[in-house]
Regions:
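N-terminal Rossmann-like NAD(P)+-binding domain of SDR-like oxidoreductases, especially those catalyzing
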Residues: 1-152
Length: 152
């Protein structure tokens, strides 16, 4: 199975890719290695999964529509696990444009390519921040998410 994992150099992305590779899947990793978190940490994570023969990595920002489309065209994945996003709740309040680009436009690029290339299965990893002003604890996937507090 060929699976794209976006945000592959992040903590969850690396562990997801590693699991899939150990299972025998082909993994196409995408990450922009931005400097919000230490890039050396991201590169160390990548080094750990680049040992696998069935791993291909693309250093690409998911906002880059043409490059994302080329990756889908070239690799012909069957599934996509979308974990890439600009991190940081506080940072999103100060820098909303970065979040609009990555977390909205980047998401749109990924989901449109999933539609255009007839991807069998799409998994989107989000954050508890989607529950926004919800006062119910613990959060549940059944709770309303119509009162966001930030773009994150």
């Amino acid at each position: 199975m060929k699976i794209i994992v976006t945000g592959v150099a992040g903590f969850i992305g690396m562990h997801t890719a590693k699991y899939l590779l150990k299972r025998g899947d082909d993994v196409i990793g995408i990450d922009n290695i931005n400097d919000y978190y230490d890039p050396d940490l991201k590169l160390a994570r990548l080094k750990e999964i680049q040992k696998f023969k069935k791993f291909d990595f693309y250093k690409v920002d998911i906002v880059n529509k043409d490059e994302i489309e080329n990756i889908f065209f070239k690799t012909k994945p069957q599934k996509v696990i979308h974990l890439a996003a600009q991190a940081g709740v506080r940072y999103s309040i100060v820098n909303p444009d970065k979040y609009i680009q990555s977390n909205l436009m980047g998401f749109a690029n990924i989901i449109e390519n999933c539609r255009n290339f007839e991807i069998e299965h799409f998994v989107y990893g989000s954050s508890s921040s989607v529950y926004g002003g919800n006062t119910l604890l613990p959060f549940s996937e059944n709770h309303s998410v119509d009162h966001p507090l930030s773009l994150y």
